[in-house]
């Protein structure tokens, strides 16, 4: 086990590159939506942002989540290091608690205007594919890591649980942002156990009522239990508009514009309280029927 934990950076990088390659090939072979912006523009800038984020993170924090979990185990910090529970139970419960913590963190970034200024860069992507799942402002990455380290210190989860969670979260973030086509029957059942691309795409709708839904990155249960789940976008997956209203030009997709986006324009328009919007009966019926049957869009799939 020590060897696996010591090889954490290499394992995470290998998993990341493997899943990214699979998603990229899948997007080319079976895209869900038509691509209007040249891939080279978005992918070059989104991937450059990953390099910047990773460098800043490594320079800022001497240890990350897995390393802190190892220290917590050695020093008896956190809840699970004070309880006598089987390792398998501690691993499973820790991964569940870490996942709901990430869900709540995501909600927080939508609820607080200053944090939304950072997070909206992720939403301002004008298309939705695997690299969208990598597009986060460096300051958001730093704040997220502080939050994650605090959760790890409080819980004291087994280090292997944190490693598994990080690898799975990275993989599912690439998967559920991918522009890939799944058979309707597969999506209908899969979204009960993992956030699917069709489920998460709703969250990237330009409509604030849909933006403030489907916060889960990994497990879909929290959205369903806490009332933030929307089954399908009102305009359908090939008809919906991706992004936010403030930043709609191709120039906004370049990294220099992305990095200064938090200080550009107001942070209004996507307040979390809009998630309490009461849908018309027609939309509620559509969501209910779509969730049961997952009828594909009437538009031809690209």
Positions of predicted regions on the chain:
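Short, strongly hydrophobic alpha-helical membrane anchors
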Residues: 1-10
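Structural signature of hydrophobic alpha-helical transmembrane segments
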Residues: 11-21
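Membrane-interface helix-loop junction between the first two transmembrane segments
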Residues: 25-44
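Alpha-helical transmembrane segments and their helix-start/interface "positive-inside/aromatic belt" motifs
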Residues: 41-54
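Membrane-embedded catalytic scaffold of the fatty acid hydroxylase/desaturase
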Residues: 51-64, 79, 85-239
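Membrane-helix interface motif
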Residues: 63-73
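Cytosolic-facing loops and C-terminal tails of multi-pass membrane proteins
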Residues: 235-302
């Amino acid at each position: 086990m020590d060897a696996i934990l010591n090889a954490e950076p290499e394992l995470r990088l290998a998993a990341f590159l493997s899943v990214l390659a699979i998603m990229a090939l899948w997007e080319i072979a079976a895209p869900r939506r038509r691509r209007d912006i040249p891939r080279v523009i978005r992918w070059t800038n989104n991937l450059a942002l990953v390099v910047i984020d990773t460098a800043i993170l490594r320079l800022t924090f001497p240890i990350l989540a897995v390393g802190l979990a190892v220290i917590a185990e050695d020093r008896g910090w956190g809840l699970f290091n004070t309880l006598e529970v089987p390792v398998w139970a501690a691993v499973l419960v820790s991964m569940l608690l870490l996942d709901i913590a990430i869900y709540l963190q995501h909600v927080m970034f939508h609820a607080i205007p200053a944090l939304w200024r950072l997070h909206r860069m992720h939403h301002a992507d004008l298309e939705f594919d695997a690299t969208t799942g990598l597009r986060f402002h460096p300051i958001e990455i730093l704040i997220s890591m502080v939050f994650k380290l605090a959760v790890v210190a409080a819980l004291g989860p087994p280090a292997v649980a944190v490693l598994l969670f990080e690898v799975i979260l990275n993989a599912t973030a690439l998967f559920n942002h991918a522009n890939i086509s799944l058979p309707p029957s597969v999506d209908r059942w899969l979204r009960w156990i993992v956030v699917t691309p069709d489920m998460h795409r709703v969250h990237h709708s330009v409509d604030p009522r849909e933006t403030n839904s489907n916060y889960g990155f990994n497990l879909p249960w929290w959205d369903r239990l806490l009332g933030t789940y929307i089954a399908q976008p009102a305009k359908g997956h090939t008809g919906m508009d991706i992004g936010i209203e403030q930043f709609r030009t191709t120039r906004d997709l370049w990294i220099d514009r992305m990095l200064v986006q938090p200080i550009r324009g107001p942070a209004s328009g996507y307040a979390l309280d809009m998630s309490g919007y009461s849908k018309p009966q027609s939309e509620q019926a559509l969501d209910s029927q779509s969730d049961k049957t997952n009828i594909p869009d009437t538009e031809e799939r690209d």
